[in-house]
Amino acid sequence: MEEEILYKIILVGESGVGKSSILVRFTDNTFSQHFAPTLGVDFNVKTIRNKETGQTVKLQLWDTAGQERFKSITQTFYRGSHGVIVVYDVTDPKSFERCKNWVEDINQYTQDGMIIILVGNKSDMVAQRKVTFEQGQEMAEQLKTKFLEVSAKENNGVTQVFDLLVQDIEATMKNSKVAQNQLNLNSEVGQKRGCC
């Protein structure tokens, strides 16, 4: 029986950018035009198969409120998380600019090397678009994150966000295990060199 892998993933961003829509599209493959704003934090679980390793991975998905009054709740959920998806609305430049603040918070409340993906949602709203794909890429480079655009409504790119996140988390975990094993080997060698 294979070992169960569990990753905690958090979705953050301003209110109304479509975090809940992305989550529900990914977990239930449905879309609703009208969502009540998330109050505090919402939680969901989805089991997927890693496309590279074939291993089963359980994702614990936390959808956080975008309102300022819930910010302290959101910060507590960063702890113990493996990855964060920062969502903005491509029709709302203010939500895009606030991504810098979200990433600063993530960096402040998590350990170094947190996997972060910047996601521009509502890419289907071409006529209302105010933030270009290139601006999203540029912001991601500045913030040192990965970047994707999605449409939760049309189910474009949503699964790719989670696939990319899982691949990056696993690569980071593998590298840290290699580093940890190297550390353990070095300490064993150091112990064996001692006298008597």
Swiss-Prot record:
SUPFAM superfamilies: P-loop containing nucleoside triphosphate hydrolases. It is a lipid-anchor. It comes from the Eukaryota. GO terms for biological process: intracellular protein transport. InterPro entries: P-loop_NTPase, Rab, Small_GTP-bd, Small_GTPase. Keywords: Cell membrane, GTP-binding, Lipoprotein, Membrane, Nucleotide-binding, Prenylation. Its main location: membrane. The keyword Coiled coil does not apply. Signal peptide: none annotated. A lipid is attached at residues 195-196 (S-geranylgeranyl cysteine). It is found in: Cell membrane. GTP binds at residues 13-20, 63-67, 121-124. One of its GO terms (cellular component) is lipid droplet. GO terms for molecular function: GTP binding; GTPase activity. A motif (Effector region) lies at residues 35-43. Pfam families: Ras. Belongs to the small GTPase superfamily. Rab family. This is Ras-related protein RabC. It comes from Dictyostelium discoideum (Social amoeba).
